[in-house]
Amino acid sequence: MRPITKLLVANRSEIAIRVFRSAHELGIRTVAIYAHEDRFALHRFKADEAYLVGKPGEPIRSYLDIDGIVALAKAHGVDGIHPGYGFLSENPEFAAACGKAGITFVGPRVELLQTLGDKTAARDLAHKAGVPILAGSAKPVVGHADALKIAKELGWPVILKAAHGGGGRGMRVVRGEDELAVALESAQRESKTAFGSAAVFVEKFIQRARHIEVQLLGDLHGNLVHLFERDCSVQRRHQKVVELAPAPNLDPATRDAICEAAIAIGRTARYENAGTVEFLVDADTGRFYFIEVNPRIQVEHTVTEEITGIDIVRRQLLVAQGHKLSDPQVGLGDQKAIRSMGAALQCRVTTEDPENRFLPDYGRMTAYRSASGMGIRLDAGTAFSGAVVTPYFDSLLVKVTARGLTHQEAAGHIERCLQEFRIRGVKT
């Protein structure tokens, strides 16, 4: 056992606040970090301690400064770091730096982050686990000719994907040979900018697909469970905007097979801590295919928490300290005892202008009135009257999660809740 007594969250806004809450309930002292541009952000005031990182004028780089964050953690007696999502959450160098400093990284081990960070290596892992994968290139393409050859073998349409990325960036759908050159150059450029690597690979594109993902949780002793599935098919620009749990109108046999496939991948990888295995389900054939594993907490983890009653972040902190899933504090020793009750739905209130191609908006919120009521959960960042929304970070303002006995009831809760919101000063 390696107890965590003081936890630094290497992140900002709503996910930092979310982690602080679970840590506080476990009696763990919390530490926030904030960039100069985030000096008025709410998350810094929700922790027991808060420290400035980086330099003025470098807001993103401040949260990516591995050496600076680890040095700060050591200087202030931190013995655990939770990376949240985004930023350094999937960076094996960060996890390695934490380990070298004697700090527990709340997430998978370094080798696993390295494997899962390479989408082609992750495809190989799924194949070894006996899980179906989409037809595609076994490794990144080396140029236009290589991409064209593979695309012709697969048949149009195909999709180009960043080999070392995610979040919808570095992805392009190509419906014919005349589109390939421009799409390849664009995907490689975006991938290089976002992930530091221009490597992309080619997959067959499923035109009518559902995006289904399974929540996993593993301990350091080889035990692994799933917490059922989520449907994340409602997307914009390959990025999720609405998530549901459980997936509605999914054939029970398909649901069971997908959850079993996720467990098979997790066991093959010897997965530990929280992670999500993502699949595409062909709406025409009912067949499903592995996409990737996200080795971190997900934005949409709240819908799973609502239908299972399980605090996933709390379990992350416990298993990182060495607790077994079967320990009373964790309470997940028996897969059959984990139940899904009711339905949950999440949507995101963002500071984007719907009349201007959803471009991010920023400025001072002159008014903010949130909503609540039966079946509603709000996970907010810097959301209050007078708050300043800066142009430097993600536009997410509040995650709204609704729970009901059915999806229809949850949808009714969330519609009423969104109508109650009043936000002025920035477009939403």
Each model region followed by its residue ranges:
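Short, Asp-centered acidic motifs that coordinate Mg2+ and/or phosphate
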Residues: E49, G80, V158
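Well-ordered alpha-helical segments embedded in enzymatic catalytic cores
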Residues: P3, D65-G68, D146
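Short, glycine/polar-rich helix-capping loops at beta-to-alpha or helix-loop-helix junctions
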Residues: I33-E49, E90-N91, K119-A122
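A conserved helix-loop-beta module that forms one wall/lid of the active-site cleft
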Residues: G99, I103-A163, G170
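Short gly/pro/ser/thr-enriched loop/turn and capping motifs at secondary-structure boundaries
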Residues: D38-L42, E58-I60, L88, E111-T115, ...
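N-terminal glycine-rich "phosphate-gripper" loop used for MgATP/nucleotide binding
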Residues: I33-A35, L52-G99
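ATP-dependent carboxylate activation and anion-phosphoryl transfer catalytic cores
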Residues: R2-H36, A50-L52, K74-H76, P92, ...
